[in-house]
């Protein structure tokens, strides 16, 4: 009797396209210093110019190449959003794991904290805090980590609640293993895909939020290559030089959409795998 072959499902075209976009952005972020060593260099004699052979996306009013600004801006936007997603994921796991596994007052305390944070408009709070404390990219990242962490906490807690009474957990409990060992060595590996899928979604939200703060002058300093800052610097040139405004806006939208598509796809795969167990 032949064993049925395992069906390998290929990702849809939208996911492949999203992964291609993310790969291009990652390459730009990683190799920006070599690809565009002088992205912020000004040529006041050139000034505003439309797309052409030497400048595929044109130049802004300071004579800076818009495409080079986008490539260099990826090196600021991507690591910043990645730090927010990773930081909030770390806090979410540290709080959500014991909340879901131990329950009781630990769970109640964690959920009250999450409810309090969810009652606050994240971007508005980030704008107020950054404005009061003087702004800065590092501060913006730190504030968003704290504001995004409750989402990860709830996702991790929910995943742990689904795993808490599985046979492998009960077997580990019968061996008198410590709660910490069970959570970290047995439960967490089974919920890691869920946490990772949620991190992709947080990555997208963080990218847009950091760009918004930079657009308002509360993120990277003036003159620094960043998608939000480039959009802000050229917003008054929409009619005279639309590409200088459209290009960074499209970069933000395309990257955030790609992250959302991949995150949703990962969620679907993780959820499907959980139902078939």
Predicted regions and their residues:
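N-terminal signal-anchor/first transmembrane alpha helix
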Residues: 1-39, 113, 191-192
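Transmembrane-helix boundary motif in ABC transporter permease subunits
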Residues: 31-35, 80-115, 127
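Generic hydrophobic transmembrane alpha-helix motif, especially the helices
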Residues: 56, 60, 101, 106, ...
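Short helix-to-coil transition segments within interhelical loops
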Residues: 59-64, 101-102, 161, 171-190, ...
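Transmembrane alpha-helices
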Residues: 75-91, 126, 180-212, 259
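Glycine-rich helix-loop "coupling/hinge" segments at transmembrane-helix boundaries
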Residues: 118, 129-132, 159-160, 209-251, ...
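Non-cytoplasmic
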Residues: 124-128, 132, 136, 140-148, ...
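C-terminal transmembrane helix and the adjacent membrane-cytosol boundary/short C-terminal tail
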Residues: 147, 193, 197-201, 242-277
